[in-house]
Amino acid sequence: MKKLIYLWLLASVLLAVACTDDDDVFSEESGVRLQAVIDECNTTLRGAENGWKMVYYPKVESYGGYTFLFKFGTKNRVQMISDFDMSEDTDYSYNFNTSESVVLTFDSYSPLHRLADPQYPAPDYSNKKGYGVEGDFEFVVKKVTADTLYLVGKKNRVEVLLTKATGEDWLLVSMMAEMSSCFALSENERLGMSVHGVLMASGLVELDDIYNICKISYKDEEGDAVSVESPYIMTDKGCQFIQEIEVAGIKFSGLNVDLSEGFNNREFVSNDEGGSIRFFIQNFAPLNLTRDQIPTYVPNKNIASVDLLRTTNGNDVR
């Protein structure tokens, strides 16, 4: 009986050792494979003369898109620019880890992190904070080819591509970043609207330059309220909507920025053939006018606060 017990114990020990050896072998093989993928990624990323381009829609059809350019270098450094950030400091760090297969992570705060920043009120969640644009700064590498890396956001699971960039891309994205500053309105600024040169008093445009959303409200010929909304992505001339929209019977797919009168008097022009609709800055900040000055103030389409004062004080002379 004792011999049987000893034999059983010996078999158990040998089995445990065998299993441990197998686990080590498989673990080692897996680690080697993952390191090979990481090496391939680094070689591919660092070998692109003009770097890489990412056109990223974190939540397509809800929010707009964003364009990034990357130039990967040694010592895990990466040069990064975007279509919304004009910072002179473009040097950041990146790394690979194996938390989920192979993961490309940008591990210093960069423009990519803004898309995951929870401080911004989210339109899809009744403007509550805590969600951000629902972007990622960690991406699971699914496939690597000579000119494309196929990625999936680690948290939000949105597929995105890294494709080889051109020298022209760097110029265009810099121009997009300059254009994006035109879409940032101050607290007291709104956009008024004219169609074929005729002012539409009911027209109002809201630009959300964090989530890249354009919302246009107006009244049609029957006096019914109409609201049209579209996410957009920046271009070197203005913005492009994700789909064509129709406003006051005019179809267009984006806005071009007119800076001919200077930045403060910039206008946004529909990109239909005739540039039929123009959106202009209106300032709602209070003016230091006396009651007697209000009725005689010369109208200015860019200063809406005067019209508000006239109506409020019973001096509406329109």
Question: What is each of the regions a protein language model found here?
Answer:
Residues 15-18:
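C-terminal motif of bacterial Sec signal peptides marking the signal peptidase cleavage site
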Residues 2-10:
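Sec-dependent signal peptide recognition
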Residues 155-159, 164-317:
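Preference for solvent-exposed, low-hydrophobicity sequence contexts
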Residues 47-48, 73-76, 145-146, 210-212, ...:
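A short, compositionally biased
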Residues 70-78, 151, 268-269, 313:
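Short, structured motif recognition centered on aromatic/hydrophobic residues
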Residues 77-221:
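Long, acidic/polar, low-complexity amphipathic helices and coiled-coil-like
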Residues 62-64, 87, 132-134, 225, ...:
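Short solvent-exposed loop/turn micro-motifs enriched in small/polar/acidic residues
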Residues 20-103, 168-188:
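Acidic/polar, low-complexity intrinsically disordered N-terminal segments immediately downstream
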